[in-house]
Amino acid sequence: MSVHHKKKLMPKSALLIRKYQKGIRSSFIGLIIVLSFLFFMSGSRSPEVPIAQGTSVSRVASKDYLMPFTDKSQGVIHPVDDGKKEKGVMVTLARNSDLWNLVKSIRHVEDRFNNRYHYDWVFLNDQPFSDEFKRVTSALVSGKAKYGTIPKDHWSIPSWIDTEKFDEKRLAMGKLDIPYGSSVPYRHMCRFQSGFIWRHPLLEEYEWFWRVDTDITLFCDIQYDIFKFLKVNNKKYGFILSVSEYERTIPTLWETTKKFIKKNPKFLHKNNLMKFISNDDGDTYNMCHFWTNFEIGSLDFFRSDAYREYFDYLDSSGGFFYERWGDAPVHSIAASLFLDKSEIHFFDGLGFHHPDFTSCPIEQKIRLQNKCICEPSKDVTWTPDYFCTRKYFSAGNYKLPPGI
């Protein structure tokens, strides 16, 4: 009796698996290899990771990285990105009508620096910002955009000012062609920048500030977190250009300052930078000051008893109105007298312009590394007489760059 063997039937899915099992096996093995490679790479990556990936200027440890001679002379280090943000903020005082000049400044700061760090930006105005201003600027900044209105008493003529005397003085200055000599808004701005901006509630959560004005240009990539730089190097005030003040705008500022110091000698730092602002050990003021169109530093310094009491003393004298005291000489005198001179820093390697002056790194290797687009021949940093950077280096006992 013959036996008929029946062929065992298999489900269609099983037939498909058998048919393609070699290809599936190969793909699975390939996937395992790729995942293993990615895991290995993530585990071996240096902990000093740039905050944002894919940029050409993320500051990582490199033996090829160059520091400007002036930074070496001042004894600082450039911090490596560690992914941790400081309590820093960009601060801009602007009107709604400044919008289309301001957007260029914002793009310069964002493209050259903040698109990697995403620090917040605070905008302040003596009038409410328009919807257009908020819409355009908030689209440009990489951090949070915050908008505040200046309190009325911070942008008005205080009660102790004799308005008739004020009008007489300012109109007389206008006839002498003193810059902004007759301007009332300019005086409000200088007074606000001198004594009130860091008191605004929007700045309470921050420790460091970078003042960004309209009509500025940054020519170079900033290769490190500039706020972290201040912190790790124990710097309280930084500048990029220093110039001489127009003497007829501040005829009594120094005498008023000396009266304050006489009453409050405790605020005068033993290791101060007096030699930067005076050629005769404090008898007279030589008009040198840090240009505040680029200004970066510690908010806590301006919140200190020394600075607040100094400003209040100046304010009570009426000089912001009867004369035309600027915020730049006020800030500069305060920093030079109340800080250790080692807490002040001259920034190089950034490239900066605000009408009518330009800072361009003197070293070609720095300009190339930082992708600077400034014209070296237009740099005024080391020009003698009107500009004061040489005097700052002399007062701080720092070496000048070769060739200066």
Curated annotation (Swiss-Prot):
* This protein's record includes keyword Membrane: yes
The record's active-site residues are E295
User: Can you say where in the cell this protein is located?
Assistant: Membrane
Q: How does it sit in the membrane?
A: Single-pass type II membrane protein
Cytoplasmic compartment segments = 1-27
**Record topology, Lumenal segments:** 45-404
Q: Which UniProt keywords apply?
A: Glycosyltransferase, Membrane, Signal-anchor, Transferase, Transmembrane, Transmembrane helix
Q: What else is known?
A: Present with 704 molecules/cell in log phase SD medium.
Please explain the role this protein plays, according to its UniProt record.
Answer: Possible glycosyltransferase that transfers an alpha-D-mannosyl residue from GDP-mannose into lipid-linked oligosaccharide, forming an alpha-(1->2)-D-mannosyl-D-mannose linkage.
> Under what name is this protein listed?
Probable mannosyltransferase KTR3
Organism the protein comes from: Saccharomyces cerevisiae (strain ATCC 204508 / S288c) (Baker's yeast)
Give the classification, highest ranks: Eukaryota, Fungi, Dikarya, Ascomycota, Saccharomycotina
Gene name per UniProt: KTR3
